[in-house]
């Protein structure tokens, strides 16, 4: 991985060990790998993967998005079981804000959680509608990476949401069906709203650049696997290798 500094356009400014490390590793300078294959052979009981590499299908790309949404939804569900309303409204990083922002923060986190759960449900329905098999959720290590303090929880939330925007931006060109493009875009814009709010309460610019920076699906997949995932009921590493390593189709 490149150790070059990460710009605002690649996510958010690093200001915390976990966030800094995560975004630094998300730099766009690593060597490219060859993409190809399909989800066959990755899910339990699936057919053996084709020996000739093929571009990922729309179902594969939806399962990629679902992998990220499972992670985000679980993050908020578990995090809001660890941290109470008082933990969030009384957090030190909110002292510079007015009473309205402080009093609303817990309810807004609940709303973000509900959005992510709805994204999971919608993606699962879309995948089944295409006769595909939705990937299940994995086991995550949020206790060590995000739940050490309320400040760390909110900081990692910012990282995840900004990364989600880069992920959708990087995946959209690999979707073929027009109706799926619309579905993906409507999720991506909500992720961007989450990211803007979390940038603000973390003391960063809510909308730092005129253009967001897309990130290749394989890079995102490998990044979240390395940083947050303990194990999965499917072969996540193999799935990551099947995803595109560029933001534009070859």
Language-model features and meaning:
Residues 2-18, 27-31, 39-250:
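All-alpha RGS (Regulator of G-protein Signaling) helical domain and cognate RGS-like helical scaffolds
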């Amino acid at each position: 991985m490149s150790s070059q500094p990460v710009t605002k356009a690649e996510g958010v400014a690093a200001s915390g060990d976990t966030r800094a490390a995560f975004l630094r590793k998300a730099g766009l300078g690593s060597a490219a790998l060859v993409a190809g294959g399909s989800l066959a052979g990755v899910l339990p009981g699936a057919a053996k993967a084709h020996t000739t590499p093929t571009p990922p299908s729309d179902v594969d790309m939806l399962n990629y998005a679902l992998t990220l949404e499972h992670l985000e939804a679980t993050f908020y569900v578990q995090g809001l079981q660890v941290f109470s309303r008082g933990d969030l409204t009384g957090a030190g990083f909110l002292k510079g804000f007015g009473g309205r922002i402080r009093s609303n923060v817990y309810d807004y986190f609940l709303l973000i959680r509900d959005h992510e759960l709805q994204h999971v449900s919608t993606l699962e329905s879309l995948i089944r509608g295409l006769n595909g098999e939705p990937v299940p959720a994995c086991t995550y290590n949020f206790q060590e990476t995000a739940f050490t303090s309320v400040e760390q929880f909110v900081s990692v939330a910012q990282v995840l949401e900004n990364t989600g925007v880069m992920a959708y931006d990087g995946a959209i060109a690999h979707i073929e069906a027009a109706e799926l493009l619309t579905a993906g875009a409507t999720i991506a814009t909500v992720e961007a709203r989450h990211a803007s709010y979390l940038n603000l309460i973390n003391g960063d610019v809510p909308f730092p650049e005129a253009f967001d920076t897309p990130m290749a699906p394989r890079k995102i997949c490998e990044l979240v696997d390395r940083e947050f995932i303990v194990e999965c009921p499917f072969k996540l590493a193999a799935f990551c290798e099947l995803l595109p390593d560029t933001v534009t189709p070859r």
